[in-house]
Amino acid sequence: MNHHHLSLTYPDELIGADAYILDKVPSLDVARRFMETQARYESTANLHGVSAQSNPSGGNFYRGLYNIAIKSLGAAMKKSEETVLEGILEYSERLNNRKGYWFMDTPGNDIESVTGQVAAGCTIVMFSTGNGSITNHPFVPISFPL
């Protein structure tokens, strides 16, 4: 049995890059669900007195990522222009026989997002960061930063 799927996580990593992500979606429902993840993240941030636009860290600023849109475009570019966003997965929702490119609504934290992907059935995790933070997971045979 050979299943090929890829998932991207972190709603907060894509604030401001939604047009690029939604350029190729199979339905209005997928686009709507993706935008709901963004709105929920922004609403939660606002409840805590924080703006989703203020997400970049000190390390991001140091490396020239001065606003969330610039940072988000870097995350979004992990998807090629031709790649279709097949759908939205809830945190740790099983991928099962689904193929293609999926977005998982995870917390904006390295270890929590990787745990959700592993619980969904991912067996290889390639995690790229600008600051070189390294995360690993005991249930994934290969987990490395790019």
Where are each of the predicted segments found?
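Anaerobic metallocofactor- and corrinoid-dependent redox/one-carbon enzyme cores
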Residues: 1-5, 9-146
